């Protein structure tokens, strides 16, 4: 370990007493890059990994996660999500390939089951707790561009905007998640105050599509004033009549968002 630290392969910080310690985020990065197994995850505060079972051949990762969420097995769900990240999967992959299909199935349970809403709400809380735990393991950029956003007014979904913030953090942004049900006026105030380079707006449910069209026009004007871009996503965008302007882009998935951000960052930093 000392050799790896001395060679610069793993970050070291000094305590107030002058002792050297490895920040958790640096340890996690090193584990992911080297594909190392963690023998005692509880030392890193990742005891949930012990609850994550070996992959079942007959079940997809999304099906495994769905089963844990439906049964309210919080530790197992958190451990499974952590295991994917530690194995080297990106946040976009975890969101698109595992969480999205699991929650799409759970979200339709209420159609055939009287306890469907209860199961969905509990599963959402478990999922959010897992993402917050995982978010704490991401290396936090100290000098990257600012990004901020949330779910639109009337949209109470928390998982999508949380995942977007995590994807952007993973790609070097200092992301500020404003959460669910964010009025356009509040988003405008945030843009004016924080001067972000990138804004995101999630729309999985719209109370008023025409009002949202007007919101996008107002948002475009604010983006122009502060030389920012916005990325939009969510199921509700399919019915929009307002064409996307030069400051607005649509991402149909987290993977598409990550690819677009990589290209955009490269264009911004290329002389």
Regions found by a protein language model. Name each.
Residues 9-139:
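Long amphipathic alpha-helical segments
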Residues 113-116, 122, 126-271:
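C-terminal regulatory/effector modules of DNA-binding transcriptional regulators
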Residues 4:
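Residues in the recognition helix of alpha-helical DNA-binding motifs
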């Amino acid at each position: 370990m000392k050799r790896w630290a001395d060679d610069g392969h793993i970050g070291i910080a000094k305590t107030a007493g002058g002792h050297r310690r490895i920040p958790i985020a640096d340890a996690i990065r090193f584990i992911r890059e080297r594909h190392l197994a963690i023998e005692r995850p509880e030392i890193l505060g990742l005891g949930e990994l012990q609850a994550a079972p070996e992959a079942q051949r007959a079940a997809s990762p999304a099906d495994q996660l769905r089963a844990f969420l439906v049964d309210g097995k919080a530790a197992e769900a958190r451990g499974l999500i952590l295991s994917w990240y530690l194995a080297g999967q990106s946040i976009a992959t975890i969101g698109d390939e595992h969480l999205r299909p699991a929650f799409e199935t759970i979200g339709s349970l209420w159609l055939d089951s009287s306890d469907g809403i209860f199961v969905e709400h509990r599963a959402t809380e478990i999922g959010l707790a897992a993402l917050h735990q995982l978010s704490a393991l991401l290396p936090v950029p100290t000098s990257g561009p600012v990004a901020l956003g949330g779910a639109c007014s009337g949209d109470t979904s928390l998982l999508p905007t949380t995942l977007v913030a995590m994807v952007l953090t993973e790609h070097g942004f200092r992301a500020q998640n404003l959460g669910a049900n964010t009025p356009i006026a509040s988003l405008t105030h945030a843009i004016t105050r924080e001067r972000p380079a990138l804004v995101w707006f999630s729309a999985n449910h719209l109370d008023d599509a025409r009002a949202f069209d007007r919101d996008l026009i107002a948002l475009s004007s604010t983006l122009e004033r502060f030389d920012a871009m916005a990325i939009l996503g969510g199921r509700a965008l399919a019915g929009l009549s307002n064409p996307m302007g030069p400051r607005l882009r649509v991402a149909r998935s987290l993977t598409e968002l990550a690819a677009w951000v990589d290209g955009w960052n490269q264009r911004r930093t290329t002389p």
